[in-house]
């Protein structure tokens, strides 16, 4: 079996000479087998290893015994041991997620922490061939694309490694028995409360008995074949993503040209955009991809809500994917501005300079959209900065009647999601300047103007 593990390691370039490896160890057969084998291979690869164990505080005394077992196992082999105790159920309740998901987040965060403390460059996880088969089967049942069928990667992110990924669970259990390792058995793995356990305990044994004795091998081979095809499509999609997508802090704009691509590529472009925004593709299903594609075929202004607090909207054929913002405060924030000083509005990351111009030669009417001039007497003393409110109206320069601010934004082709971010300079409560775009007819300089007001708006650096 050790030779099979070495073959997996070398085939996937998992371990190089002088690597420092954190081994994730629960105390069960898989992780104890992995730790023991990597200990035996220390001299071959000239590696340093440590063990990281998380006590989830779910199974009471049994969890404490798991921790004690792993600690003593490490002491016996003189392996450095790191442990974290955390109430996973409490964290799950606070974050409103399942205990299973909370446990995974906590474990992987701890592995990363130990990686830094141990100055490691690899983290070894004990997934095996049966885990791979169960994962693929579970995703097929739930509904997945090729990305899900490819299963668990032998190497992820260049440093998460799975040396047992091609080893059957039966071989692992035999190794533990032959080496007299006496691993801990997690009783919850025998409960049928989780779908994965039902697949392991009921479905796969049923398929083995009635359809295919080597279903584990068949599912693993399926994963390998799909990985080859999927990796090629991902490579194409990556180049198309760079060509058609523009990333901002909380937004990705997918240009309309992207939607002429084949659906196999387009769906991957969309998934990449989602991953950029929320660092996860969890909960993103085919129906959501289809909704985004449908939104692009609709008229400008069409928008849809998506999982993970995202929204997509059509902006003249381009699709803007963004994180939804709290709109409850839109139009309610208002900031008083003062004459002859730089007004810093730190909350909005803005600096607004206001001063009286005494010499008309100082006026620069052309070339800077962030500096505008107004009749100071018309402006009055009450100057504020705010954002749009429902029912706002504005009289654009050169016109004699008010227009709805909403209609002005539409005519300017300002995306719906950007409209809430445009600062408005107001005099006595009336909009005088849609910053970056238009000034009001009501406060313009004319032949009767005696005092000129200069307002300059900038972003804080």
Swiss-Prot record:
Primary enzyme class = ligase
Q: Which residues bind ATP?
A: 26-31
Q: Does the keyword Nucleotide-binding apply?
A: yes
Q: Which CDD domains match?
A: TilS_N
Keyword Cytoplasm on entry: yes
Task: List the GO molecular function terms.
Answer: ATP binding; tRNA(Ile)-lysidine synthase activity
Gene Ontology terms describing biological process = tRNA modification
Any single Pfam family the record assigns to this protein: TilS_C
This protein's source sits in the domain of life called: Bacteria
Localization recorded for this chain is:
Cytoplasm
User: What chemistry does it catalyse, as a reaction equation?
Assistant: cytidine(34) in tRNA(Ile2) + L-lysine + ATP = lysidine(34) in tRNA(Ile2) + AMP + diphosphate + H(+)
Q: Which GO terms describe its cellular component?
A: cytoplasm
Database matches in InterPro entries:
Lysidine-tRNA-synth_C, Rossmann-like_a/b/a_fold, TilS/TtcA_N, tRNA_Ile_lys_synt, tRNA_Ile_lys_synt_N
Q: Which UniProt keywords apply?
A: ATP-binding, Cytoplasm, Ligase, Nucleotide-binding, tRNA processing
**EC number per UniProt:** 6.3.4.19
Matching entries from NCBIfam families are given as:
lysidine_TilS_C, lysidine_TilS_N
**Function as written in the Swiss-Prot or TrEMBL entry:** Ligates lysine onto the cytidine present at position 34 of the AUA codon-specific tRNA(Ile) that contains the anticodon CAU, in an ATP-dependent manner. Cytidine is converted to lysidine, thus changing the amino acid specificity of the tRNA from methionine to isoleucine.
UniProt similarity note = Belongs to the tRNA(Ile)-lysidine synthase family.
Q: What is known of its domains?
A: The N-terminal region contains the highly conserved SGGXDS motif, predicted to be a P-loop motif involved in ATP binding.
Q: What is this protein called?
A: tRNA(Ile)-lysidine synthase
């Amino acid at each position: 079996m050790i030779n099979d593990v070495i073959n997996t390691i070398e085939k996937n370039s998992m371990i190089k000479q002088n690597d420092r490896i954190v081994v994730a160890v629960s105390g069960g057969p898989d992780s104890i087998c992995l730790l023991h084998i990597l200990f035996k291979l220390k001299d071959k690869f000239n590696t340093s290893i440590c063990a990281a164990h998380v006590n989830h505080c779910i199974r009471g005394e049994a969890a404490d015994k798991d921790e004690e077992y792993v600690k003593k196992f490490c002491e016996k082999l003189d392996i450095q041991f790191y442990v974290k105790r955390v109430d996973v159920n409490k964290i799950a309740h606070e974050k409103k997620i399942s205990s299973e998901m909370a446990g995974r987040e906590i474990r992987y965060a701890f592995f990363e922490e130990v990686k830094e403390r141990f100055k490691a460059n690899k983290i070894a996880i004990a997934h095996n061939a049966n885990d791979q088969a169960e994962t693929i089967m579970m995703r097929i049942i739930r509904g997945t694309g090729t990305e899900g069928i490819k299963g668990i990667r032998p190497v992820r992110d260049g440093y998460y490694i799975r040396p047992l990924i091609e080893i059957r669970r039966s071989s692992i259990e035999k190794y533990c028995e032959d080496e007299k390792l006496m691993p801990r058995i997690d009783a919850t793995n025998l409960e049928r409360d989780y779908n994965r356990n039902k697949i392991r305990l009921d479905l796969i044994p049923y398929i083995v008995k009635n359809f295919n004795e080597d279903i584990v091998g068949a599912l693993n081979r399926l994963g390998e074949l799909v990985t080859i095809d999927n990796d090629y499509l991902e490579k194409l999609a990556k180049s198309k993503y760079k060509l058609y997508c523009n990333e901002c802090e909380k937004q990705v704009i997918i240009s309309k040209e992207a939607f002429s691509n084949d659906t196999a590529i387009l769906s991957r472009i969309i998934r990449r955009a989602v991953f950029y925004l929320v660092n996860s593709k969890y909960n993103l299903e085919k129906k959501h991809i289809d909704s985004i594609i449908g939104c692009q075929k609709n008229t400008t202004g069409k928008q849809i809500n998506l999982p993970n607090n995202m929204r997509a909207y059509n902006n003249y054929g381009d699709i803007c994917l963004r994180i939804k913002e709290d709109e409850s405060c839109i139009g309610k924030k208002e900031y008083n501005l003062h004459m002859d000083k730089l007004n810093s509005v730190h909350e909005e990351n803005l600096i607004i300079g206001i001063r009286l111009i005494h010499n008309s030669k100082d006026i620069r009417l052309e070339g800077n959209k962030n500096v505008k001039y107004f009749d100071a007497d018309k402006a009055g003393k009450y100057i504020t900065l705010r954002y749009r409110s429902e029912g706002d109206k504005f009289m654009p320069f050169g016109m004699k009647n008010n227009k709805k601010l909403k209609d002005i934004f539409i005519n300017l082709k300002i995306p719906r999601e950007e409209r809430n971010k445009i600062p408005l300079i107001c005099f006595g409560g009336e909009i005088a300047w849609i910053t970056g775009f238009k000034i009001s007819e009501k406060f313009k300089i004319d032949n009767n103007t005696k005092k000129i007001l200069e307002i300059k708006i900038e972003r804080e650096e």
